[in-house]
Amino acid sequence: MAHFTSDGLALAYDEFGPADARKAIVLVHGFSANRYENWKRMGWYDAIAAKGLRGFALDNRGHGESAKPHDPAQYSREAMARDVFALMDHAGVERAHLLGFSMGSHIALTAALTDSGRIDHLVVAGVGGKIFDPPREEGAMAAAMEAATPEEISAPMLKSFRHFADEQKEDRLALAACSRGDRM
């Protein structure tokens, strides 16, 4: 595991596949996940390396082994998209394929809209059919992350996110801040 800096935050990432590959891909995970759970454990590192691509997977700010600010302003879509480009710059990668899952898809879409000239191909998965709908109930995810116990959470979807965050030993206050940020 290595780190790079974006907006003054230390963000963790893995590099895999041939270092001299002509093409690179950046993987961006979903909310309350991390690079290991979303990508490595599921076999993506090996599959990408087998295709001869140089791969990178970061832990988004507030997740995994990356910095975990508790300020919602640190989690704008634009800031998280800058993290993708900061990783590419750190690695000396001018252009890359970009694959995002769930929240990572929102980040990837923002990155592509910000600087499409640096993105070879964009793949978004787990986006959901409501990507263009108005935001859900304001603060519901944050409240689930801040609840003293999962039993205090009534909505099944929110309870499942809380259980997943607890299983991954994530910083729930950072996740609450992330959910309050302008990320979706």
Identify the residue ranges that each predicted region occupies.
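Hydrophobic, aromatic-rich cap/lid helix
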Residues: 162-184
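The conserved SAM/SAH-binding core of class I Rossmann-like methyltransferase domains
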Residues: 56-58, 101, 125
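Conserved acidic catalytic loop of the alpha/beta-hydrolase fold
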Residues: 78-96
